[in-house]
Regions:
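Charge-rich, low-complexity N-terminal segments
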Residues: 1-144
């Protein structure tokens, strides 16, 4: 059994602001990340799959198919977007990298079988680096 990871990147802006909390509490909680006009990140995401090497091809997955899935579900909808305003999932959910990781994982998981219809490979985990020092990881089995 192998784990294979492929790396992608996109740029997006966001503002950390919880609607259910007041202005002062938002400022206290999120600091400069709560600035009204937002700020940007060059996100690096790593998508990991697991599975055996296919007997015929000697490969775990077709990276071209994975690229197509990630492009359609993540890069096209998120790149050069404002996450709060332009991604429906973040109208009411704060676009922290924790929540972004869940949203990316959910999108890939939901559409995985259309690109990889067989038993293998399976989506294993998503890792997202918001900055060089802030890295978030979630396993596909942990979300619905
Ligand atoms: Ni930020």
């Amino acid at each position: 059994m192998y784990h294979i990871t492929r790396r992608y990147g996109f740029a997006a802006s966001h503002r950390l602001h919880a609607r259910q909390l007041g202005a002062e509490e938002n400022r206290r909680l999120y600091g400069k990340c709560n600035n009204p006009y937002g700020h940007g990140h060059n996100y690096v995401i790593e998508v990991s799959a697991r599975g055996p090497a296919d007997e015929r091809t000697g490969r775990v997955l077709d990276t071209g198919r994975l690229d197509q899935l990630v492009r359609n579900q993540v890069l096209t909808p998120f790149d050069h977007r404002n996450l709060n305003a332009e991604v429906g999932a973040f109208h009411d959910v704060v676009p922290t990298s924790e929540n972004l990781a869940i949203e990316i994982c959910r999108r890939l998981k939901t559409n995985w079988s259309t690109v990889f219809p067989g038993e293998w490979p399976k989506l294993h985990k998503i890792r997202i680096a918001e900055t060089e020092r802030n890295i978030f990881e979630i396993e596909a089995d942990e979300i619905q």
